[in-house]
């Protein structure tokens, strides 16, 4: 793969253990590709899509993803921090047990994403869409959730102590825990 790729498509390709550090992509579509063990550190991606891709033991630290999609992709044992994501779509992705402490996921779509056991302590999830996300055992303590869209089960299954929330979310939290807030 070239150091800079634009307007290309890769389907079912294996990038296992490849050095893709400093890779630049623009509007590139990866479908069902395998990035197991690949080094994508210091890479920069704009408008690219990673559909149903596998990231296992992949290094993504110091990488930037702008307006990208990881629809249905799975991440396991990856080095992600520090990572910059700007309006990224993680719909249906699997980020279970991933370390995203202090990550800025503002304005990202995490609809129906598996965040089971994910460490999101002190992460910024402002205005993120977490509708339908599975968050059993997720650590969200101290995170900024203001303006985030979540389901009632989010409030009962994720550890949210010390999280920053807005008034509507505080009411939703109380209702999810069966509190009578009507007076």
Task: Walk through the language-model features, giving the residues of each.
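Tandem repeat scaffolds
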Residues: 1-183
